[in-house]
């Protein structure tokens, strides 16, 4: 059904474009090839939601944490301990479940950080994954949620993350959080997300051609509404144990992680590591460059459907399309 509907709408889009120029929802905005990074950067200090913790084994050179809406609902988290550094990104909740005012993404992030804080310093990647999984699984059992979440994976507490282990000198990447290790950059984008982002973009382009305005989009995102039912269903792909499943992906959700899907990077002699969530469309070697790239997109493509195609844009009253976290460390060896 999805391909048929999309095919029909694409034909409609092409027909209308032949009749008139493509409606430019970005009119009065200039898309600059060279990013304007001449900004007031004071917000990086004033609006930073992370309170720095120090480690004897590495120096935190840059860090920033900011929720898309406010600190209380921020589903990103940063952790620095003597032997670990981590950025954890709780997935946007697809259910109405809350505990003490916290949605599932926030709860997942906090549970993962708690597990990392309890890691023995020389733990390996597989045991680390098991401990995080067990922490979330135990929460399900404690709150009588397990049976329901076994049947409805879309309601699971889900998070992605990147973790640096000083003792192992490795970075462990689970899901679509990002990292830079020396000259290596891994965004770890999921193929299924690109498909959904493109579907949302097409639906919204048709809506624009049919007369929707920016004010209309602030009230309702038709592309997001179109893909949302599948976003709820695609959870069946996370930690899916079926071999050869093209679209499966690893996450922290309280169920066994397939270790062959976890990326493990050997740091070697490199000294600089950057960890971030996917709240940054592209990760750069400095916080300001990463922020500048993000701001260029937010200024010129607030719906996140052209310059940067995403499964969601900026909601009215929010600062960005997603929470964001950035952590840059230099290793002492």
Protein language model annotation of sequence segments:
Residues 17, 29-33, 210:
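Short, flexible helical or helix-coil boundary motifs
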Residues 22-26, 37-333:
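PP2C/PPM-type serine/threonine phosphatase catalytic domain
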Residues 3-4, 22:
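Generic short N-terminal amphipathic or hydrophobic helices
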